[in-house]
Amino acid sequence: MRIPPAIIAIGRNYADHAAEMGTKTDERPMVFMKNPASVCRHGDTIVIPRVCREGGPQVDYEGELAFEIARDCRDVPEAEAMSVIAGYRVANDVSARWWQKTGSGGQFCRGKSFDTFCPMTDLVPAGAVQDPQDLDIETILNGQTVQKANTRLMVFPIRFLVAELSRGMTLLAGTIVLTGTPAGVGAGRTPPLYLKDGDTVEVKIAKVGHLVNRVREE
């Protein structure tokens, strides 16, 4: 898979996910970055690195809809936002929770950026997805559904995200934007449900694709 120039991710973009993590949705989008080198493809193995042994079990799944920027753009009006989207992908924002919260001083980037921590499907052209704000999304772990929602439940819709992210900041062609995950992540459960060696995690999004990855511990 081609390495994108940037991966921008949105946190707390589904109210039910914010609630399960003990937080609230924000008045403005919560924005963080993932290392572009974290990308991998459908069918590749998610490898939990040895460094994730620090902090105990922690590697989590987050099924998400992603979109790709078609051309360099800046200060895009919300009314024109959809014109700069090349297409959509199914993504899994794999997250090492201890590194996300404690191991890196409270900054999300490192815990989200280990190699293979951003599996994605191939691009589906924007014209093939009539309404990206009405897509069923489902995450399945070892045959059991763990997340199920619809993209219409996003707090900040895609049009707004494009306009907001491009304010004063150039989005380069090929930039990937992950739009957030709904409730059901492993960290929000009692007891927590984290990925482990031998697991299979799937993310399905209607009209966009089906992402399947096995998990291996390094």
Identify the function of each model-found stretch.
Residues 18-19, 42, 76-78, 98-100:
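Short helix/loop capping segments that flank catalytic or ligand/cofactor-binding pockets
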Residues 17, 23-25, 49, 97-218:
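Catalytic-pocket segment enriched in acidic/His residues
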Residues 1-64:
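Extended, compositionally biased flexible segments
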Residues 64-68, 138:
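Residues embedded in well-ordered beta-strands
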Residues 54-57, 73-78, 124-128:
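Short helix-to-loop capping/linker segments positioned immediately adjacent to catalytic or ligand/cofactor-binding
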Residues 16, 68-71:
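Active-site-proximal alpha-helical scaffold in enzymes
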Residues 74-88:
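N-terminal accessory regions of nucleic-acid-interacting proteins
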